[in-house]
Amino acid sequence: MLNTVAIIGRPNVGKSTLFNKLTKSRSAIVSNFSGLTKDRNYGLLSIGDSKTFLIDTGGIDSSKKESIENEISEQAWIAVDESSLVLFVIDGSEELTNLDSEILDNLRKRNKKFI
């Protein structure tokens, strides 16, 4: 069984760009507009003989009350539950936001290993 790594974070922090770079693909749509990734997207990271499944997710945003945003967030948390490790992506050009802190707290409560 291969290890599985979920890539999560708030909307538009570069999750899909990172996923495409690591999987050497263009399977994740990348744009300046948030909300394009709606479901989990699976890919394979290969380094030498080592292989790992990666899961690209939509942005987690608990401040949005619309059902589609709730579904996107739920899909991201399902990916976290499926994974053995989480890559928590933040925007390094900005201060840590309340939403970033909320996601971090939720990761800690789930007792998941994360980077």
Which positions does each model-derived feature cover?
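Conserved G1/Walker A P-loop phosphate-binding module
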Residues: 1-69, 73-80
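Conserved C-terminal guanine-recognition region of P-loop GTPase G domains, centered on the G4
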Residues: 47, 71-115
